[in-house]
């Protein structure tokens, strides 16, 4: 895979440059474009993944199915498909926006900051998983309600972006509808 870059954003959310992905993620990470996707199987179960210990930020933390950064000239939908294939070895369809104006800033225990405008999507998996161990160390198909209860009871056990995404009532309800096939 070619070297990934992040699309830098100004405070109005407009692109204002690019920076190599690993150079961008520091203690002073600039605002940049990202995405987050919650992937469900045909039984309505959510794919929860555990980030590889090789990840620069939040290694070993449980999170939603796949996250990443669109590349210059790439749509968010194309970027989600690219990362689902790269991280999970999976094909997805039925991409549906869940929380299009999600923005967050969080600092991991090592001091690395995430500072992202990060639209959230849901999708269906249409192939088997083939996890990339450099990206994902474990995964589990879980009932969405069990995951939401776990997040509510132990938010520290999940990535901060996952916790913040479902703290939005509308996003939580849209994920429930998607899981139930509505």
From Swiss-Prot:
Cofactors demanded by this protein = Mg(2+); Mn(2+)
Q: Which residues bind Mn(2+)?
A: 25, 32, 69, 114, 116
Where's it found, cell-wise?
Answer: Cytoplasm
Instruction: Return the cofactor note field.
Output: Binds 1 Mg(2+) ion per subunit. The magnesium ion binds only when substrate is bound.
Q: Which InterPro entries match?
A: Idi_bact, IsopentenylPP_isomerase_typ1, NUDIX_hydrolase-like_dom_sf, NUDIX_hydrolase_dom
> What interactions and quaternary structure are annotated?
Homodimer.
Q: Which family does it belong to?
A: Belongs to the IPP isomerase type 1 family.
What is the name attached to this protein's record?
Answer: Isopentenyl-diphosphate Delta-isomerase
Species name: Citrobacter freundii
Specify the taxonomic lineage.
Answer: Bacteria, Pseudomonadati, Pseudomonadota, Gammaproteobacteria, Enterobacterales
């Amino acid at each position: 895979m070619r070297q990934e870059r992040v699309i830098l954003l100004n405070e109005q959310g407009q692109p204002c440059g690019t920076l190599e992905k690993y150079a961008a993620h520091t203690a002073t990470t600039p605002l940049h474009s990202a995405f987050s996707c919650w992937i469900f199987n045909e039984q309505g179960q959510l794919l929860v993944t555990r980030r590889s210990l090789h990840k620069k930020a939040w290694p070993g933390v449980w999170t939603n199915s796949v996250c990443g950064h669109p590349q210059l000239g790439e749509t968010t939908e194309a970027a989600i498909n690219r990362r689902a294939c790269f991280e999970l070895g999976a094909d997805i369809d039925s991409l549906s926006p869940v929380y299009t104006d999600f923005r967050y800033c969080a600092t991991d225990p090592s001091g690395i900051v995430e500072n992202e405008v990060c639209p959230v999507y849901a999708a269906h998996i249409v192939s088997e998983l083939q996890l990339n161990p450099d990206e994902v160390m474990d995964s589990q198909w879980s009932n969405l309600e069990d995951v939401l209860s776990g997040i509510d009871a132990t938010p520290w056990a999940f990535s901060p972006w996952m916790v913040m995404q479902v703290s939005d009532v509308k996003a939580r309800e849209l994920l429930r509808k998607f899981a139930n096939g509505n």
